[in-house]
Amino acid sequence: MKHCPGRLPGEKRKRACMNPLVVIPTYISSRHSVPSDRNDAVVYDHTTPLMSEGELPRCLKSLNRVRGVGAVAVLVAAERGIEQQAAEKVREIASRFPLLSIMVVTAGELDIVRRRFEQLRLGRLEFEIGLSGYSAIRNLGLVLANILGFDSIVFIDDDEVIDDASFLEKGMYGLGKLTRRGIPILAKSGYYLNAEGNCHSLSQDKWYNRYWNQGRAFNQWIDQALAGPRLSRSNHVCGGCLALHKEAFKRLSFDPWIPRGEDLDYLLNLRMYGSDIWFDNKWCLRHLPPKGISEGRRFRQDIFRWLYEFRKMEYSRTQIDLQQVKPSSLEPYPGPFLQPGIEKRIRKTAKLRSIGRPDGKEYRKAAKAVATEASEYARRNCTRYFEFQYVWPEIMVRTEGDSILRNALLRSVVLCSEEGVIEPPAEQMMTASIDAGLTKEVRLNVSE
């Protein structure tokens, strides 16, 4: 591991050592169930059945080989009614990796956080921060990092495999540094490789994708990013290969009202509030998801996502305190999906795919959703994130260094070791010290 050395002559304040919390959400269901259409805000790409091993052990095994890993928080998002069994299942899995300092965060720990919120008169914030919904789960990870004193956070997903022992070192590279123009690098994304070692979208340029060439647009963008300097402003975010500096997550939360695509949405939020996410073309891992929801149902979720995003971006342009983010600044991806006419494109794509793809029934349902539930959802909720943003910095200020909450959490979470399950002392968890690189060298690898 690249430990931070003592300062050399002329290097004052140019080195920074980072202590990231690694956060891994895992989603547990009672069986291979398909969520109801009426609950579009909490549909996951895939869940692990309670009686199945799932992908988490494979992920932790690969993380075991990574240099510099300090604390790992596994957030257990369980279907209602099986929270206790899911917690026991994940604790048993964590116990197989005694070399990792794993905190298993369950409904019990969440209740501790919420009770403290109430004591601090912040409200319980049950929708915005919790163990249900992609963004709420990520927000819980941010809150935990803030409470426990970590200066950064790295999100990975339980269906990923890390092959590079320097994964965290690459993730921390440049984080917290200033570019030549004085712009802080506060958020970074890497990229995914599939089972064949390819980073490109496999979405095909078929006739039924004429109005929805998302894969081609993404491939065009990532080819440009991979060919350029190591760090460049990103138009895309891989939420399972994402590093955030505390100065980013203390200011901005994830948006609990977006059904999926919360990672790209975070990029747009950062831009609206005057910051950015940087793409690191040397930082990657393998994404090996199991079979999840049907492609028609996934497209339905995309409809909710893009209509909501379009409405939200439109609303943001009416706010004088926000930076305007234009679709033209997000070419070739995702700009075209944030332009007027998105509803017509969605309808046409759903109809064409209902003919050309096997999942025709779900695509026909999706086409109907444009004019009904999805449009209404976007209209009803597009302002709520900005209202929550008035509250979020206060949450961060009030919980940072809160010894009562910190100690209560440390007493509650369990750390799995060779001797069994023990309570983790605070000192044992704050062990990572990863060099973010020399400022001068980082600046040579940044495209501005």
Question: Where in the sequence are the language-model features?
Answer:
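N-proximal low-complexity "stem/linker" segments adjacent to membrane-targeting elements
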Residues: 7-68, 74-78
